[in-house]
């Protein structure tokens, strides 16, 4: 057998043991998503490969490209949720876009490069949030001092006297000892008053007190939003915002509570403490090394092969695919924060492919998504597990909401199975929208309860322990399921 040469010239580092293994990643995804093991395994391997790439030598690192994934399956089976949860696990910048919203360069609409600009914005916000947490404690102390300065303005002349040197003080003493004693006394009174006020601020006893604060008035803020929706106009909007931000801002005085002033001042102090150049640098690195772009509805830009030749909308669809090619393959995209290389951004595409097929994508784009995973339609048993097992299960959400009204809501196992059976049946007879069907069914099932509970609790006309059984489910939903027209519009 012919073996490739051993990579002796490429030293590697071992991956930190604290990093998630593919098995652990799948276990984490299992907490929120039922089934779809093939898709989970594929994204887990892709995430682990990123860690592996970051630990090889720099020379070889640039040669290792991500294995982009295309997920094929009907709506509501977990495609988007898998990608979103994966990004949270990886603590990576993540953006979800819809392929059908993009247009070919030269047409009115968003161009494909905007997805990378959105990803960079997401990364900057993420890093800024991390840095904010790091400086929040220091910012809180600075805000406290500023609030004390507003509540107890320093007495004129005290600050200067605090910095007087020994020799100068000696001269002052000889000149007028009484003035020095009086200033020292005022300084001590001010210090004690300030300490008492500080304690009251920390205890939260002054949060409702009104103070006057000088704030910047953002007169031009809303003006820039008109540039947003159109492709190239986004760049113009960014340039205009940068120009406006360089102009001196008007300041005006506003009356507000200390609680409101604290939030405003904290934002100001955090901005002063954070080095935005470092934030942008870190954000760009995160995008290039660990960014994830989820392209939904990619089947909408795949033109079915009909033998009619590319005409009408098919030409534009193919144009979008060709515009996507360099982005997915790896190119440099200009953003307002700098140039970003997309060579190692992970792209996960998804589509139902009811009409078109993956083979209807242009061959070059197919080659950029080497891993294909088919997600299965959800069964009645899957619906039952979705309602009971995930940490964010719908039934748990409704129970938590009604707890706020002092109501304990319970579902019998038979009731949950009846809900699952109803969801599966409606998906078969009307249109298969996957797990999203459970939202509409539970909303209709609990509508009267959710509407009338506040008054019934106040009147004492309701049992605090409510149990939903299968008979109630059939009684409430039976007619809707039986009538195809009703279920089509209501469920």
From Swiss-Prot:
InterPro entries noted in UniProt: AAA+_ATPase, ATP-dep_Clp_protease_ClpX, ATPase_AAA_core, Clp_ATPase_C, HslU, P-loop_NTPase
Annotated compartments: Cytoplasm
Pfam families assigned: AAA (PF00004), AAA_2 (PF07724)
GO biological process: protein unfolding; proteolysis involved in protein catabolic process
Subunit structure: A double ring-shaped homohexamer of HslV is capped on each side by a ring-shaped HslU homohexamer. The assembly of the HslU/HslV complex is dependent on binding of ATP.
Function, in words: ATPase subunit of a proteasome-like degradation complex; this subunit has chaperone activity. The binding of ATP and its subsequent hydrolysis by HslU are essential for unfolding of protein substrates subsequently hydrolyzed by HslV. HslU recognizes the N-terminal part of its protein substrates and unfolds these before they are guided to HslV for hydrolysis.
Protein name: ATP-dependent protease ATPase subunit HslU
């Amino acid at each position: 057998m012919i073996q490739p040469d051993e990579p002796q010239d490429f030293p590697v580092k071992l991956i930190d043991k604290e990093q998630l293994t593919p098995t652990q990643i799948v276990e984490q995804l299992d907490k929120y998503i039922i089934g779809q093991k093939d898709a989970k395994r594929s994204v887990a391997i892709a995430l682990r490969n990123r860690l592996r790439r970051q630990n090889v030598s720099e020379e070889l690192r640039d040669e290792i490209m991500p294995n982009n994934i295309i997920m094929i399956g009907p709506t509501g089976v977990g495609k988007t949720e898998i990608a979103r949860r994966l990004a949270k696990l990886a603590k990576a910048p993540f953006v979800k876009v819809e392929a059908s919203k993009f247009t070919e360069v030269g047409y009115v609409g968003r161009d494909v490069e905007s997805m990378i600009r959105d990803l960079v914005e997401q990364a900057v916000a993420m890093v800024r949030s991390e840095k904010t947490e790091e400086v929040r404690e220091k910012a809180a102390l600075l805000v406290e001092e500023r609030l004390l300065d507003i509540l107890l303005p320093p007495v004129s002349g005290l600050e200067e006297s605090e910095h007087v040197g020994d020799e100068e003080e000696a001269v002052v003493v000889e000149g007028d000892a009484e003035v020095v004693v009086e200033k020292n006394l005022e300084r001590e009174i001010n210090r004690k008053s300030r300490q008492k006020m500080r304690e009251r601020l920390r205890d939260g006893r002054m949060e409702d007190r009104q103070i006057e604060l000088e704030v910047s008035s953002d007169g031009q803020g809303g003006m820039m939003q008109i540039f947003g929706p159109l492709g190239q106009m986004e760049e113009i909007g960014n340039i205009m915002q940068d120009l406006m931000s360089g102009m001196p801002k008007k300041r005006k005085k506003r009356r507000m509570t200390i609680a409101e002033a604290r939030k405003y001042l904290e934002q100001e102090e955090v901005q002063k403490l954070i080095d935005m150049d470092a934030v942008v640098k870190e954000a760009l690195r995160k995008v290039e090394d660990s960014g994830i772009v989820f392209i939904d509805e990619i089947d909408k830009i795949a033109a079915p092969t009909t033998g009619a030749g590319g005409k009408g909308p098919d030409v534009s669809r193919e144009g979008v695919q060709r515009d996507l090619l360099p982005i997915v393959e790896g190119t440099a995209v200009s953003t307002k924060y700098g140039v970003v290389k997309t060579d190692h951004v992970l792209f996960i595409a998804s589509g139902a492919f009811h009409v078109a097929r993956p083979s209807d994508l242009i061959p070059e784009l197919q080659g950029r998504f080497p891993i294909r995973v088919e997600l299965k339609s959800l069964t009645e048993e899957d619906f039952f597990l979705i309602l009971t097992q995930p940490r964010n299960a719908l039934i748990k959400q409704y129970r938590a909401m009604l707890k706020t009204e002092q109501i304990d809501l319970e579902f019998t196992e038979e009731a949950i199975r009846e809900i699952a059976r109803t969801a599966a049946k409606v998906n078969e007879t009307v249109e298969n929208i996957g797990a999203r069907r459970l939202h509409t069914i539970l909303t209709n099932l609990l509508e009267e309860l959710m509407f009338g509970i506040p008054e019934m609790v106040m009147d004492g006309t309701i049992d605090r322990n409510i149990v939903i059984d299968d008979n109630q489910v059939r009684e409430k939903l039976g007619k809707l399921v039986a009538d195809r027209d009703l279920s089509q519009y209501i469920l």
